[in-house]
């Protein structure tokens, strides 16, 4: 438990460090949720801002509103008015004349009698602007009204109807409406007509009083804070609250999913697992880490929601528990979603959107009462986002008193039930995480079948239970010895007893089988092998030999099919957890976090591996950092380290802590020889007490480091033993390399020399005779005669015209190749056949007949066809997903096709009766003014039929407070402002004044209660009441309403916005593939290979246009079928879509230059297009509607100008503009127009069409200009006119001689440098490249004033440390970057001024594998054949020839994305050699390749380079020696030497290397004493290494006292024969020369060079 606790703390520290380093991420986690919550409150506050007017609404006199242009029309159903009706109208005229102080005749013009209902309606339709209102009398007699006081009696009432435009009154079909009150009756003409009519009726029936009636909304009853949110809670929070809260919390889920998938993607989690990571600790650590920021934010959200009382009734504890549990379920969902992603680019986004979509579905599930509550609970148990939606719904409705009564609580889940589902969610999700982690397949690791829980094996053997059969099995270290003896296997070297007793790893009959489409494949075939403590064990083999599979089984990533292995006594089949506690690993992938520093990495892994003391962690980390040569980089983020430094950090991670079993997979990959040497020293110094398993493709590394070496092929152990054992067993002898004398090279006789050697060594073989060097192979069996032979050879050197010679022993690489080709006879036959098959040679040698645009275009289109067909996801994203979105927009457009009415068009009559409107239970509170109010109440209102519903309030009662406290009981109330007694009895005021207060949502309250009181007052006077009815006219449409009639404006807007989203997604996905090709350098390789830049863009445009055309054609056809407007304007819509596609795609390409991945590019470009387009579109919609509403031509002119600007800024906006025009959106019409007569006019579609055409041209030209900018810069700036800095003062003599030769333009002499004669096919003079530093970074001379000429047929090698200038040189020669100064000439053409001709015959194999992962090797080679201009009829032959030569036949039809690194390099090299180029630039061709592949590559390069110039850069010394007739070593951009390999070794070499193996008898006297005997024979020797019976020494060979090879062999074979079992001698290697010449740069050299540069740049004062 203590160990798990320690791991948990370590992982928490790591996670928190990562979180703290991501300042942007922390800001997002804090700011994003706050913004979301603030957005919720902004909406809620916005809803509250639109609160109604609570002030008193006063009505003015009728006379102030009516005039000759604003008349009253009146009439009756009977054709004429009866006496009472005519009397009332006359009374109205009379009262109006008194108010206006005019005569009756003058006032009469304000009235017009129309006694036909239809005629009145027609008149209103024609003259609506001149009609104040209408009055209609339906009956010629007084109507009867039932008396609610006494139901057996009826009373007479005077009936009339007021007629206004239906949009000036409220909907007669509704009694209540949320958010609407009676104020419209007061603000429009209704109140004036009703008051005037009632006043006229009063006057006619003898009650001559002026009516002053005002209106006021009920005082706001929501006085408490929680009540103030009711409107927002009802309209927003009830439904969308959970969405906002989920979105705020999902930022943490987004980040967590991304982090989890990134660690899976980068194999960091895999590496930690191998080194003992507990998976439960891993998951818990990430949950805690996420909660560190998520929980405080969650609590802040809770405090805001409860503190603001948006959530009021639900208790604090319920809200806290609900949201905390929900947050925890979201974190668990993050783990579940992360299981299904291998790449991080879409993981977080898709998780975010999916959970949010589930939450939105939960809104409908929670609110729909038709869904059974048990089904709701079940869904909540499965999906917690549904639960939170239901929770917010019930919390909200509890705080909406008017709503709760209408909800069936039996169909609503309670908060406590939801908490219960959350608890279940947590348990269920935890189980699901555990279950999915066991069954979901990943790239590495063993997984169970989905049904594993139902198997007997799992419950008896799995789940951590020990297999008793295996537990009782004792492994025997002597098994392998017995196997060897029984099989007489002399390929395995016996292990001494004292070493055998230190066995730490014992592999027994280990076997792994894989089921493939081709049947069963055996990756490891009954392997038996032992490894020992204190040793480095090299595990070698060609690609696919089973090395990685074996290591995967030893580390627990794979389970064996049969057999087992024991590591420190623990069985890998059931004790892997124990094994991993002592395991360290350095995978091929760098398992590091870019944000963390070197020191933080080491401290984390030290703690993870069991070191608990903080001081010890610190000291161990510092010590390790210094030992791996990163002491000066302690606080440098790992992402800023070079590739080699990252490998060193991974090495330190593997060794730090308690690791005793170390697996190193390609630990020195990507390092230069100097860095590799330092790593070797580190490994040798740390191997004590450890077992190190080393895999590498550098055989010299395995040779130098490994105590024992195992070579595996096809899953079987081929041989196992020390390096010397393998060399003696499989060695092919010594290599003798002789340098011919320069002055007498033409007198050299190869037959004479060969015969001399053959006389003493009969089996000698001539390997090569090229230029100034000749090489011989001397068999190992002739070792006893070497002493005499070399003595005789030394005496005859001058006779043979040989200046010097070198001797080297069989290398481990040669052993490896011999073993590999012995096993793989097919490979051997292919390799040997490459040079002899004439037909193969002819096919490979097919030359380019010239680059053809048509051929390139066809090839690039075929490439797009194949990649698109193989990548269904990209196809789905680029075509189907946008199509679905667009179809969705059309569905919205047509499914919501019913016209949305933004005005009231109800013309049903409505009688304003309290009984009819609000029933018998509605109470009418009434408060009268004056001291006699109660008397007045009983006297003057008791005759009302609704008197029983009146509620008298005396003056001591606070009227407003009463209404607030009892607002649910009444629809309206009355407050008299003048005592009725003074008005009706004393006749002192002649005014009846009261305020009619209307309750909110009761839309007809004001006219109902005015009619109620006026009816009561009149009845009290003479028993006659008043009945008022609303009889609306048909609505007269405004210009905007006419324009929008018959259409759903909302659906048009939604349709266009969603369609814009679809086409934005289309454009973004197309740009994603361009961004990906640029990031993966595919485009660069195409350009280097001769692809014309405009052809590249044309091919992409044509392909994307093709898909876009399909999309737009489907869109046009569907819209034409479902909508007549689009059918009528099909041509316009189709043209706009075509132009839009032609413009948006190149614009998206332009945006793609700023993004580095498909996911980022697609998402960002989609967002850019959509956001810009939508913002502009919505802004213009609002502006155009304002134009029509205000009928402003000046505003229309401004809109036109803005419209043009928007069209120019965004093609998407221009396209949307055309859609608006075609759809007939009212905002698209010109002022005064009811329809569009000419869609093609400039005021309509022509303007966006023309601008879209301009977009097409501009953006297409723009992307070409950007890509052709290097050419333009080259034409404007010629590097030949810029002087390079002067040559270094200490320049090597051979380098100076080459500079002088080229400057004099003399032909190349035949020299010892192997340059041969004839003219140079490639030469550069004064080549210099200075990179200008940015900020504080200094300028850097990448290449410093280099001069070189290379003739046809020569392979030239470039060596140097990382950053020496090799790749920069190759890039300048390839025309990829421009030199700062100097001249490059290729085949007589200047690279700058005659670029096309110079690069015509140049081909490049770049350092990177810029392969199209979705194409096979065959498809890839066919593509580049066409790019390079190979004739179409020859392409198939050429491709097949290269596939055969490179041994790619078995995988030629598989996508290159699945190839190993070596096979990818073979394809890249083949691409470079296609078309028989005259100059081939090969940059690190063998990087990541095993020796067999390197051997095959060397054969290909050697065979094909006979008539070419080849420049080769490499970190492999053996590769340079095998291929290059001339070479140089670069340091700080300068040539440090120049010549053949033997010339350079002779000139700069330090002597000879001697490797000896002592006899076992030496153990008795001690190895140190035996070593002392060797040193006495070689006094100047230095011991380089000693382990077991092996020792390596270096013998200096000073020029003043040279040592002869014959003397060395003589001493070894005579004086030391008694103590030596075996020995080997070789000249100082090229690698040692390399290390010598690439030592640290001296400060004085840098200062001197800087001074020379300054002197060169200072102008002459003369």
UniProtKB/Swiss-Prot annotation:
UniProt keyword annotations, A-Z: ATP-binding, Membrane, Nucleotide-binding, Repeat, Transmembrane, Transmembrane helix, Transport
Alphabetical GO biological process terms: lipid transport; sorocarp development; sorocarp morphogenesis
Entry annotated with the keyword Transmembrane helix: yes
Binding site for ATP 1: 541-548
Subcellular location: Membrane
Domain ABC transporter per the UniProt entry, residue ranges: 505-739, 1322-1557
GO CC field: intracellular membrane-bounded organelle; membrane
GO molecular function terms noted in the UniProt entry: ABC-type transporter activity; ATP binding; ATP hydrolysis activity; ATPase-coupled transmembrane transporter activity; lipid transporter activity
Principal location: membrane
Record membrane topology: Multi-pass membrane protein
Membrane-crossing segments per the record: 30-50, 242-262, 284-304, 317-337, 346-366, 377-397, 417-437, 872-892, 1052-1072, 1102-1122, 1130-1150, 1163-1183, 1201-1221, 1246-1266
Sequence positions that bind ATP 2: 1360-1367
Keyword RNA-binding appears in the UniProt entry: no
Family classification: Belongs to the ABC transporter superfamily. ABCA family.
Protein name, as recorded: ABC transporter A family member 5
Gene: abcA5
